[in-house]
């Protein structure tokens, strides 16, 4: 009986598929037979007179080059701010992440995310700091016992 369960399941699936396809064919309407009425083919276009106020507003926007964010931009900015703060809380500062990636005992799976974070942090500014720091001047040479004594 247990051996027949997969066979019964496949048969039910095939039966259901054929039933659905038969219903689609029976109720389907071919596109060439359908004719649209004249009222659905025409579209309405409303025209608005352009006034001098509109022209002044357009010129003012052209000269000031102000780009005000739309609603979608505001939501995108809020989301990116949330993710930015989340990543900095999760991984810490950029130099901490670089040290953890270079460490030999670090987890390889987490290092993948740390490397992605490093690429992202190289483009973005820290959300809580006013200035960004250049890490190229702070590179530390590896310890060499021969030259250090």
Swiss-Prot record:
Keywords: Host membrane, Membrane, Secreted, Signal, Virulence. It is found in: Secreted; Host membrane. The keyword Signal applies. One of its GO terms (cellular component) is host cell membrane. The keyword Membrane applies. It comes from the Eukaryota. A motif (RxLR-dEER) lies at residues 57-79. Its main location: secreted. Residues 1-22 form the signal peptide. Secreted effector that completely suppresses the host cell death induced by cell death-inducing proteins. Belongs to the RxLR effector family. The RxLR-dEER motif acts to carry the protein into the host cell cytoplasm through binding to cell surface phosphatidylinositol-3-phosphate. This is Secreted RxLR effector protein 47. It comes from Plasmopara viticola (Downy mildew of grapevine).
